[in-house]
Amino acid sequence: MHSRREASAAPFSHASAAVLWGLPLFRHVPEAVHVSDARHNGVVRHARGVARHEVSVPDDDIVVIGGIPCTSLERTVFDVARTLPLASAVAVADAALRLVAWDPEDRVYDQGAASTWATAMEERIARARGARGIRQARWIMAFADGRAQLPGESMSRLLLHDLGFATPRLQVRLADSSHLYFVDFGLDDAKAWGEFDGEGKYTDAQFRGERTPWEVVRAEKEREDWIRATTHRPLVRWGMQHLASPVTLGRRLAEFGIRPPR
């Protein structure tokens, strides 16, 4: 597809740019490759598997990744936040903030970097008042959090919000002199902990390293026992099968006596 459009200066954009940036397209399968140019502002034309957004893209909103021109991270999130379904767009915004502010080595979130980037995005959104999807984009940027590690955690955040839980703490650090653990969700209003379990934690060598699946399960059990005994809070796990709807996740939490305060 790239060879068919090399003669054009139009950069890849929207979901296609998100792919180039390594951002997850959670529950969204693009039907076309997206590019943007400035022929007729606001029109989207589809031809031969290409969706051409005829909108202006300034030079400082164009970067090159692997030799391929695409929209900048900020412009990509701006476009996606306005045009993709809410869950897909939140996963993209969370992942973009993670690129900006998360240090994977030290597991530290640079709140200053995150705030600076979010403010720039808010200013961009404010300048586009009245554009298609701008209300959703504004909500998403206020909701986005780069501490969400996986798209399933982003979706979990949305469903917890819909269920009426207070904003959870993410990647909560729990430690004593001999232990250091991180928990995905601190559900403080329910005095509980939550964990989203992607299947890769137990099966993907990238996540489990040299350990066998059984060794991973045993280490997780020891970790959970320590967290429960130390914090005196329940810990509930859920997986992708529980993210079908707020009701589905709510039922999973209720099995452990965890409900949003009324």
Q: Which stretches of residues belong to each language-model region?
A:
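Surface segments flanking catalytic/ligand-binding clefts of nucleic-acid enzymes
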Residues: S8, A101-R262
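Short gly/ser-rich loop at a beta-strand->alpha-helix junction or flexible surface loop bordering the NTP-binding
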Residues: M1-G133, Q149, P260-R262
